Amino acid sequence: MRKLFTSESVTEGHPDKICDQISDAVLDAILDKDPNGRVACETAVTTGMVMVMGEISTKCYVDIPKLVRETIRGIGYDRAKYGFDCETCSVITSIDEQSVDIAIGVDEALESKKGEMDKLDAVGAGDQGMMFGFATNETKEYMPMPIEMAHKLSRRLSEVRKNGTLPYLRPDGKTQVTVEYENGKPVRIDAIVISTQHGPEVYLEQIEKDIKEHVIKVIVPSELLDENTKYFINPTGRFVVGGPQGDSGLTGRKIIVDTYGGYGRHGGGAFSGKDPTKVDRSAAYAARWVAKNLVAAGVADKLEIQLAYAIGVAKPVSISVDTFGTGKMTDEEIVSIVNKVFDLRPGAIIRDLDLRRPIYKQVAAYGHFGRTDIDVPWERLDKVEEIKKHI
């Protein structure tokens, strides 16, 4: 049976991704000075303006306007002709402390209040909710091919802009890849869509030629392309006005880009700007860590795990898995292995993945999962041998 599946990515200059990177820059700056700081930082951008808001409890001081301007400069919005300038945009901040009611549940979990605790039971989940982790062996990154290819194309777009290969490119851009599957395995790429912001002096014909030569051919293996592959490069014909001048942006608006491109389910909680006591982030990272190690250990070819939490309670209220018919054992047996090998209380996740560190801005663009260009703890295959002992 053949089917098509499509995923998209965006560049670091996309308005929503600007916001994600600013929120995580603030988080990293606080964790660097105060590893126990509590951060829930949201950002909004529009023409000529950035607003940073949220709830932050910390003993340290960070210069938020300076962080905002440095982040925007690093992305590439450093002159007025790009429609957004790190030097002249206004920066508005509105920061409160974390709610005392939330802090009570995080600082002392329900298990602690009942006296049923060890040290790690003392950290309660920062909110209720469900988080999903996913892995598949269809790529070496253990990621679905559509999102993996889309991210690589987006990263390449920024690379050729920054290194001067295509100097007329500007920071905003999007990619989309449609993969054809046969009997559950990727066999070819059916369509590639790339929209990239550019200077007014360049024509579409030149952009199409350059993107195919310097982006697509460099990234996509030739054996996945054929005479029937369709290319859509700046299909509107012109993309000069972009970034926050073209669209307003918000933190947490690209949660599918951040994860599995729609191939795996999503619990709905965004990542950026949240410290690791927020299970929206830390438990989603842990779920990816669990799923990737299980697939690498040969438990299944494809696996999705769901974790669910109650606010102020340390232990997950439920754990479930789905192997989509590829499992080498029952789902119940896999859950049993998960409970034996992994400790999924928030305090244990923070400890085992060493999450109280400034490591988040680097994943705020081009995906939080499947990253081989950087070292992030939830991508490590450090539990494979232990899992195999239980198979």
Swiss-Prot record:
Its EC number is 2.5.1.6. GO terms for molecular function: ATP binding; magnesium ion binding; methionine adenosyltransferase activity. It catalyses: L-methionine + ATP + H2O = S-adenosyl-L-methionine + phosphate + diphosphate. Binds 2 divalent ions per subunit. Binds 1 potassium ion per subunit. It is found in: Cytoplasm. PROSITE patterns: ADOMET_SYNTHASE_1, ADOMET_SYNTHASE_2. Pfam families: S-AdoMet_synt_C, S-AdoMet_synt_M, S-AdoMet_synt_N. Mg(2+) binds at residue 16. Its cofactor is Mg(2+); K(+). K(+) binds at residue 42. Residues 98-108 are annotated as: Flexible loop. Signal peptide: none annotated. Homotetramer; dimer of dimers. Catalyzes the formation of S-adenosylmethionine (AdoMet) from methionine and ATP. The overall synthetic reaction is composed of two sequential steps, AdoMet formation and the subsequent tripolyphosphate hydrolysis which occurs prior to release of AdoMet from the enzyme. This is S-adenosylmethionine synthase. It comes from Clostridium botulinum (strain Okra / Type B1). The lineage of its organism: Bacteria, Bacillati, Bacillota, Clostridia, Eubacteriales.
